[in-house]
Amino acid sequence: MKNKSLFEVIKIGKVEVXXKIXMAVMGAFG
């Protein structure tokens, strides 16, 4: 359970980073 929770947190963190990168890229090109 603990490992799955950690995996979920890492997955969510990657999604957040990705979103921020995407938003930065869109801001740079938009």
Curated annotation (Swiss-Prot):
GO terms for molecular function: 2-enoate reductase activity; iron-sulfur cluster binding; metal ion binding. Its cofactor is iron-sulfur cluster; FAD; FMN. The keyword Flavoprotein applies. Disulfide bonds: none annotated. It catalyses: butanoate + NAD(+) = (2E)-2-butenoate + NADH + H(+). Its EC number is 1.3.1.31. It comes from the Bacteria. The keyword Flavoprotein applies. Keywords: Flavoprotein, Iron, Iron-sulfur, Metal-binding, NAD, Oxidoreductase. Involved in fermentation of amino acids (Stickland reaction) such as leucine, isoleucine, valine and phenylalanine. Dodecamer; tetramer of trimers. This is 2-enoate reductase. The lineage of its organism: Bacteria, Bacillati, Bacillota, Clostridia, Eubacteriales.
